[in-house]
Amino acid sequence: MIDCDGYRPNVGIILSNQERRLFWAKRIGQQAWQFPQGGIRRDESPLDAMYRELAEETGLGPEHVEVIGKTRDWLRYRLPKHLIRRHSNPVCIGQKQIWFMLRLVGDETCVRLDSVQPAEFDSWRWVDYWRPMREVVFFKRHVYRRALRELAPLLFPEGMPGQQRQPRTRSGA
């Protein structure tokens, strides 16, 4: 399902543990790390899609998590030109996402990356709050920044943790 602007409706999932560290997963067979995410089907609400994607990608069910909140609006990213499938109809130019902040209330041993085949991830770890912004693929970075900034007060009511700057690259001598 792609909207009239070419964006595929999608949900993103930020899962926190009790130490307020975030679930960070490695895409199978790649060195790319990301939060769980996935498309919203025509007959689904964003909340229903989030629970389905959570189960498919992590093996966790509603009994394992508490929904802390979600973004107010859709957050959009465009795909780089080389990833756009120009021969599909309609053409998908990117994703629009509602992001959910969850807290793990079950045991992390319940995480099963192989609960659905084919699996999307082959490894996962807990990371500091701002680390995903530095490690995610470049074209998703601004959406991660917006989602993390908007949802941080829900996880850190006493004040947002310090945001680490992205490393700068140097050119020339």
UniProtKB/Swiss-Prot annotation:
EC number: 3.6.1.-
Keyword terms: Hydrolase
Protein purpose: Accelerates the degradation of transcripts by removing pyrophosphate from the 5'-end of triphosphorylated RNA, leading to a more labile monophosphorylated state that can stimulate subsequent ribonuclease cleavage.
Positions occupied by motif Nudix box: 38-59
Gene: rppH
Cofactor: a divalent metal cation
PANTHER family (alphabetical): GDP-MANNOSE MANNOSYL HYDROLASE, MUTT_NUDIX FAMILY PROTEIN
Pfam families associated with the record: NUDIX (PF00293)
Family membership noted in the UniProt record: Belongs to the Nudix hydrolase family. RppH subfamily.
Highest taxon above the source species: Bacteria
MF (Gene Ontology): pyrophosphatase activity
Residues in Nudix hydrolase domain copies: 6-149
UniProt protein name: RNA pyrophosphohydrolase
